């Protein structure tokens, strides 16, 4: 619905494509990426 909370985790376990490329070359991955960091 329209009142759904912001998605903190994408279906793939990533936080979106913005950090997707960052995690890919940083080696941080998606699951290890902590929200708010």
Curated annotation (Swiss-Prot):
GO-annotated molecular function: hormone activity; receptor ligand activity; toxin activity
Chief localisation class: secreted
Gene Ontology biological process terms in this record: regulation of blood pressure; vasodilation; venom-mediated activation of G protein-coupled signaling in another organism
Annotated transmembrane regions: none
Pfam families with a match to the protein in the record: ANP (PF00212)
GO annotation, cellular component aspect: extracellular region
Keyword presence, Repressor: no
Keywords of this entry: Disulfide bond, Hypotensive agent, Secreted, Toxin, Vasoactive, Vasodilator
Keyword Zinc part of the UniProt annotation: no
Disulfides per UniProt: 14-30
Tissue specificity field: Expressed by the venom gland.
SMART domains: NAT_PEP
Source organism, top-level taxon: Eukaryota
Compartments, record wording: Secreted
Function (record text): Increases urine flow and decreases blood pressure when administered to rats by intravenous injection. Inhibits thrombin-induced platelet aggregation. Stimulates cGMP production via the natriuretic peptide receptor-A (NPR1).
Similarity annotation: Belongs to the natriuretic peptide family.
Protein name, UniProt field: Natriuretic peptide PNP
Species the sequence originates in: Pseudocerastes persicus
């Amino acid at each position: 619905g329209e009142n759904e909370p912001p998605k903190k985790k994408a279906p793939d376990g990533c936080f979106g494509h913005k950090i997707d490329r960052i995690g890919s070359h940083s080696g941080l991955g998606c699951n290890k990426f902590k929200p708010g960091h």
